[in-house]
Amino acid sequence: MKRIVLFLATNLAIVLVLSLTMRLLGVEPYLTANGLNLTSLLIFAAVMGFGGSLISLAISKWMAKKSMGVQVIETPANSTEFWLVETVRKYADDAGIGMPEVGIFPSPEVNAFATGMNKNNALVAVSAGLLSTMTRAEAEAVIGHEVAHVANGDMVTLALIQGVVNTFVMFLSRIIGHTVDRVVFKNEEGHGPAFFVTMIVAELVLGILASIIVMWFSRQREFRADRGGASLAGKGAMIAALERLRSLHPHPLPDKMAAFGIAGGGAAGLKRLFMTHPPLEERIAALRAVQ
């Protein structure tokens, strides 16, 4: 609840600053006089921006199960499944969250993810490849990392951040489109083709810039989840798991699941700005530096 209030307050503060700036610069009266109601536009952008993000969050477990082919363990069928469920249960208790659903998805790659609407209604899933490749201690560290994602509320946090950036991308792109339509193309009635073309281009450009912000937050949450995994499973085990991942070069999860997996693909140069995960070398170094 505190997280939601914080981000709504942040969103409101940005809106107020933006509105005041536009008023001081004479932009708001000009836009209003030329047929653009900023209050209505902002409400529309917020409803659409947050609506899409929160709906995605609400159906995230269902989507993950369908897209990844996750088999939820209702009753453990063997010793491995029993160990997996009990490990998640122990870490969930230690982290003070409700017991997540536990599942396995059929992939030879070494990976895992967590998703869900809130801390007490989550899903933690690991790949078959992880279970067959990693040692128990390494796998437990990966599970601890995913439980830490849930305990830290990372799914909700990133959904709210995405909602904020969605709102401002939609809001600013329509202002830009309206201004170009009125000032450059001298369209006095309604909105012509210039508005829609400019709006789409502005949404694309602003959306790319906004994704850099979201990805930066995602990378910071990974460092925190690593520390959480180290706290639950042991620092040595967490470092060993990351080193194993580095040696295996794991295939990344699909885009919608990547932010909550254990590993991300490597990238250099500008591509680093769009990474959901920090490089494994940086994550290992950060953990080694923790006292």
From Swiss-Prot:
Membrane topology classification: Multi-pass membrane protein
Record-annotated membrane-spanning stretches: 4-24, 39-59, 156-176, 195-215
EC id: 3.4.24.-
Gene Ontology MF terms in the entry: metalloendopeptidase activity; zinc ion binding
Alphabetical UniProt keywords: Cell inner membrane, Cell membrane, Hydrolase, Membrane, Metal-binding, Metalloprotease, Protease, Transmembrane, Transmembrane helix, Zinc
Entry annotation: catalytic residues: E146
Any single GO BP term: proteolysis
Binding site for Zn(2+): H145, H149, E222
Cofactor note: Binds 1 zinc ion per subunit.
Top-level taxon in the UniProt lineage: Bacteria
Annotated localization: Cell inner membrane
Cofactor: Zn(2+)
Enzyme superclass (EC): hydrolase
GO cellular component: plasma membrane
Family, as annotated: Belongs to the peptidase M48B family.
NCBIfam families in UniProt: PRK05457.1
Name the UniProt record assigns to this protein: Protease HtpX homolog
Gene that this polypeptide is encoded by: htpX
